[in-house]
């Protein structure tokens, strides 16, 4: 029996690496996408992942043709994935009064939103024909309540949640599942730049364990950790 295959973007650090390790531990072959491919190879070797159980694809998720080409390359080299995780994303603060920050917003949406759709794109025809598969979008609790100074990131993650809701309805008749995961604060190189308190901070592998459960159960939507879901809902209820 062929081992299942997981296609994961943003695999060079943080959540992406933690998810890759968790899926490897569950017996999946890996298709790992990153710009820094040498780092992915070193990480795989350090974690004892055999070269025969993974492939690395160089791509920039912000460039549509680049990530689409990586997906098509995966289809040719490893076949149709069972799980596709659109994890790659960026978070940059912005000031609407600053002209240059309009470009920051465009780059954020190109990566976090168009990049997600482009990640899924090559695999949708095969999954709908096969009538199975799981598409996973990584959102954020920041998509539930906007944070001052982070308009681009918060808006992009709110769009992720809505996009995955739409896609879920489109894919359901074909037996393809769409899972939205909204992390709270995870200890990654990205969040270590934050200069404010991060309640319920999780280690990446703890997040990956809970994320794997949610994906395996085909949850439509899950906030991880659940406490941040409560916090986000309370904040959402407050006057803006």
Positions of predicted regions on the chain:
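Conserved mid-core segment of classical short-chain dehydrogenase/reductases
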Residues: 91-106, 149
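Rossmann-fold cofactor-recognition segment
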Residues: 47-65
């Amino acid at each position: 029996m062929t081992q299942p295959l997981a296609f994961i973007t943003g695999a060079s650090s943080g959540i992406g690496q933690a998810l890759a390790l968790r899926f490897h531990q569950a017996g999946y072959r890996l298709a790992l996408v990153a710009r820094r491919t040498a780092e992915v190879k070193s990480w795989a070797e350090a974690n004892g992942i055999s070269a025969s159980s993974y492939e690395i694809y160089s791509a920039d998720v912000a460039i549509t043709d680049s990530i689409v080409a990586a997906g098509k390359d995966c289809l040719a080299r490893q076949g149709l994935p069972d799980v596709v995780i659109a994890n790659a994303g960026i978070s940059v603060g912005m000031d609407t009064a600053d002209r240059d920050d309009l470009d920051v917003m465009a780059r954020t949406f190109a990566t976090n939103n168009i990049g997600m759709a482009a990640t899924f794109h090559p695999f949708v025809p095969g999954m709908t024909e096969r009538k199975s598969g799981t598409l996973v979008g990584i959102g954020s609790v920041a998509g539930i309540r906007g944070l001052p100074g982070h308009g681009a990131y918060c808006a992009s993650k709110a769009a992720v949640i809505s996009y995955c809701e739409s896609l879920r309805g489109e894919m359901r008749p074909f037996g393809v599942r769409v899972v939205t995961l909204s992390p709270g604060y995870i200890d990654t190189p990205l969040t270590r730049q934050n200069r404010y308190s991060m309640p319920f901070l999780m280690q990446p592998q703890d997040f990956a364990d809970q994320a794997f459960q949610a994906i395996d159960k085909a949850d439509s939507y899950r906030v991880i950790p659940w406490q941040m879901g409560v916090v986000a809902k309370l904040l959402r209820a407050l006057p803006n």
